[in-house]
């Protein structure tokens, strides 16, 4: 039987705020080659997030505060395929896909990042499950 699962907004806000608090004071947005949450793959660019990384949840969504550009990216020969939100110690909290458009995170400058390139993030939101 097919169906739809939803959660009350208050619960979604709790989950979204838990993501933020778990990221702690040194959160990072890391663009990566292929990988999974358990095995995130090679880091191409690492951007530091503000403390706290996100504002309070509303409607199950948190919006990132300032994200500092990586001004000396490691670079890659293969396209970026994933991104992680992780603690400063490297614990992955969120793993998502990346594409040029129509994905969870969209890279407007292309998916291949050159060594030494600057990688910036102009806006980022996280939405807890519906």
Where are these regions (language model features)?
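Small cysteine-rich, disulfide-bonded extracellular modules of the LU/uPAR three-finger superfamily
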Residues: 1-83, 87-130
């Amino acid at each position: 039987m097919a169906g739809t699962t939803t959660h009350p907004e208050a619960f979604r806000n709790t989950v979204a705020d838990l993501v933020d608090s778990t990221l702690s004071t040194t959160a990072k947005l890391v663009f990566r080659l292929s990988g999974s949450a358990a095995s995130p793959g090679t880091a191409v660019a690492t951007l530091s997030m503000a403390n706290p990384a996100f504002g309070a949840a509303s409607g199950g969504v948190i919006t990132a505060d300032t994200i500092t550009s990586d001004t000396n990216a490691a670079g890659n020969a293969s396209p970026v395929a994933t991104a992680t939100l992780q603690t400063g110690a490297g614990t992955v909290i969120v793993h998502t896909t990346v594409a040029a458009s129509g994905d969870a995170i969209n890279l407007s400058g292309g998916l291949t990042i050159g060594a030494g390139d600057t990688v910036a993030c102009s806006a980022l939101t996280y939405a807890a499950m519906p």
